[in-house]
Amino acid sequence: MSSTFKQYWLPEKKGFDSLQLRNVPKETPRLGQILVRLKAVSLNWRDGIVAIGTYPFPGPDAVVPGSDGAGIVEEVGEGVTEWKVGDRVLANFTQDHIAGRLTRDIGLTQLGGEQQGLLGEFFIFPKTGVVKIPDYLSFEEASCLPCAALTAWNALYGLTPLRPGQTVLLQGTGGVSTFALQIAHVAGAKTIVTSSSDEKLEKAKALGATFGINYRKTADWAAEAMRITGGKGVDYIIEVGGTLTLQASFDAIGFNGQINCIGHITNPDPLGAGKDLRGPDASFLALDRLCVVRGVVVGSREQLQDMLDCFEAKKIRPVIDSVFSFDKTREAYDHLWSSTHTGKIVIQIP
């Protein structure tokens, strides 16, 4: 057995060309740890902004990217009784977020940004840093769940649980929005998906979307959402745009609704060049609609397990846009940044 393994890292954060493949020593798990042979890692938009150096949270100057991975337990350390060699596991995005509220200190244990990530052949986890993969899911499918799926679950169930008959508006067809669509559909909710592409909207409808709005053809998608809901507005919004879409989200939300702020893809550098972009008066607009504006940063291990229980009961499968081999990781990043995908981008690890 080799004493080293292959791993991608970013010695500097100056773009996707900074990605380098290296050999690193394979260590033995210590007390309370497990060694996992990773079989698949999926990418999130966050991985892109980490690579280009605009990720707005603290982290090491040089980092191993990748937060979402799945694999097989290869070795267990002393004191580990929860896992055995051969178990199929997937990563918990925020390693120390076991249950309850996220704190700033716990947030510093997020993989692939605040601490070293998974884009390699092996990783040593604490025994609480993983959960069991449901039997019906492949490694590639399981690797899609830790960030995007759990974020969607937290958005719809973390504060006020979604109820049948309510309406959820989903911006775009990226990972979080697609998972939120699948979750809302099995919950009996109505869904409105916005996209710049009729083709993507057709794919969303195949997943159960009730309505689709092409915002290139219907620029005022908030007014269209109001029309669809008979002037009442929507109950939940998956807000991934940020500065340039937040006003429209306020225009589309109903009274006592919930705007879940997930990302800021219209402003990928919010603390740099984009910090001067003027957004809406959120305080006034929240009062005007009596709505909740909530930042959602993934979720806890407990929520991840709850989500997996639901997924297994309903046999929800992630939508995978494309699968790249480990040696095509750079191309996977390019595809991520092209915004032409629907669903998740996965990297297979041999």
Predicted ranges, named:
Residues F93-Q171, E199:
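NAD(P)H dinucleotide-binding glycine-rich loop of Rossmann-like/cofactor-binding domains
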Residues T167-T173, H185-A248:
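Adenosine-nucleotide cofactor-binding segment
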Residues P25-V41, T54-I98, E114-Q116, P134-L137:
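Glycine-rich beta-strand-centered segment in the early N-terminal region that forms part
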Residues M1-A70, F125, R216, S338, ...:
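Short N-terminal strand-loop motif that marks the start
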Residues S2-F5, G231, K315-S322, R330-P350:
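C-terminal capping/lid region of NAD(P)-dependent oxidoreductase domains
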Residues I106-L108, A187, V240-S322, Q348-P350:
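Glycine-rich phosphate-binding loop and adjacent beta-alpha segment
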Residues S177-T178:
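N-terminal Rossmann-fold NAD(P) dinucleotide-binding loop
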